[in-house]
Amino acid sequence: MMRDFVSEEKLKLLFEKYYRSTDIDPPALITKREVGFMTFEGEIIRHMHLSNKFELNNMLRTTVPRHVYSSAAYYKKPDEKKMPEKIWEGADLIFDLDSDHLPGAEKMTYEEMLNSIKEQTKRLVNKFLVSDLGISEKDIRIYFSGSRGYHVHVSSEDVYPLGSDARREITDYVSGNSLSISVIDKALKTGEKRPGGWIKDVISKLYELGINAEKISQKQIERAIDQVKSHNATMVDAPVTYDIHRLIRMPQSLHGKSGMMVKEVDLDKFDDFDPLSDAIPKIFLEGDYDINVHEKTRKLRLLDYKIDLPPGRNRVPQYVAIFLVSSGRADFL
């Protein structure tokens, strides 16, 4: 869809207003991370090296990018153009949970999608990372992506050296892809003591269904596996996790398709976090704007404003205008 040039320039000015009013803290070890961004013209700039907070904020205020990223990886030479020459030294363990990937997402409202993916994020952190894998909560950070889901970052000496294969195994585990009839059958036949994780859950489900372990069939095991997976599996975007050179959205930056912040959420406050209120920059709460809505908007909420607009000219709060223009649903007038 072609975007209106004048409207895009207005949106860029509003993004600039945000970056000039906000001191963004760089990710830890910024000197070892590759930094990249996408301009409002669609150009992708990569292989940048920044030394400190001043350089980061100066870059944001002078270039005013639409999207900003930094690498999960740490490099000896992050500004080298060829990956082998960067000299990889390790990487955070990253999980990307996107509500677009949820079953039945096309029938959900935006708010319902975000609520559902939030529950999956809680499950990933509490059940899999902390309980099953023994990762300390102090090494886990949750970020609202700024649009449709959450990013979970794990930073610790235990995960830094993990290669792509080990990271892929972790995604297979949290999504339940590593679970099979043969794995459960073996655990039942060997009488594995104190099974944990998925095996424990499936065996518990078998007992719950009243199935005798001595007369169990593969079909019954498959049924239990399907029920447990449907309740416990977490849908992560696997390539984001196992790609050890991946760029991920930079915390506190604006998402170019929503105008909302990539916002960190404390683990102990995650239940109360409302992205449709808490991720809207305060500087976007001032004033109203005229916009041209392309087609009737699907019902959704931002703060306490119910967006249900007809096509054509509408006057809306600034943050609503930014959201609709950023997502391609409207243009500034």
Swiss-Prot record:
One of its GO terms (molecular function) is metal ion binding. Its EC number is 2.7.7.-. Signal peptide: none annotated. The keyword Transmembrane helix does not apply. It holds the Pfam family DNA_primase_S. Its cofactor is Mg(2+); Mn(2+). GO terms for cellular component: DNA-directed RNA polymerase complex; primosome complex. Keywords: DNA replication, DNA-directed RNA polymerase, Magnesium, Manganese, Metal-binding, Nucleotidyltransferase, Primosome, Transcription, Transferase. The keyword Transcription applies. The active site is at D96, D98, D237. GO terms for biological process: DNA replication, synthesis of primer. It is an enzyme of class 2 (transferase). Catalytic subunit of DNA primase, an RNA polymerase that catalyzes the synthesis of short RNA molecules used as primers for DNA polymerase during DNA replication. The small subunit contains the primase catalytic core and has DNA synthesis activity on its own. Binding to the large subunit stabilizes and modulates the activity, increasing the rate of DNA synthesis while decreasing the length of the DNA fragments, and conferring RNA synthesis capability. The DNA polymerase activity may enable DNA primase to also catalyze primer extension after primer synthesis. May also play a role in DNA repair. Heterodimer of a small subunit (PriS) and a large subunit (PriL). Belongs to the eukaryotic-type primase small subunit family. This is DNA primase small subunit PriS. It comes from Thermoplasma volcanium (strain ATCC 51530 / DSM 4299 / JCM 9571 / NBRC 15438 / GSS1). The gene is priS.
